[in-house]
Amino acid sequence: MSKRTYQPNNRRRARTHGFRLRMRTRAGRAIIAARRRKGRKALTVSH
């Protein structure tokens, strides 16, 4: 039996999908804008 692939880690989660990482690229900023337009309560996992 292989180990489970999801090993939760808050720091890794924020660094991979966090707000500052999203703002770094044009595509990431587009994601934030789309989520704002849609009215998402949480824009990113860290924000």
Swiss-Prot record:
Q: Recorded GO terms, molecular function?
A: structural constituent of ribosome
Which keywords does this chain's UniProt record carry?
Answer: Ribonucleoprotein, Ribosomal protein
Query: Which InterPro entries does its entry note?
Result: Ribosomal_bL34, Ribosomal_bL34_CS
What Pfam families has UniProt attached to this entry? Ribosomal_L34
The GO annotation for biological process reads: translation
Cellular component annotations (GO), alphabetically ordered: ribonucleoprotein complex; ribosome
Question: In which family does this protein belong, per the annotation?
Answer: Belongs to the bacterial ribosomal protein bL34 family.
Q: Which PANTHER family match?
A: LARGE RIBOSOMAL SUBUNIT PROTEIN BL34M, MITOCHONDRIAL RIBOSOMAL PROTEIN 34 FAMILY MEMBER
- What's the protein called, per UniProt? Large ribosomal subunit protein bL34
Report the source organism. Thermobifida fusca (strain YX)
Organismal lineage = Bacteria, Bacillati, Actinomycetota, Actinomycetes, Streptosporangiales
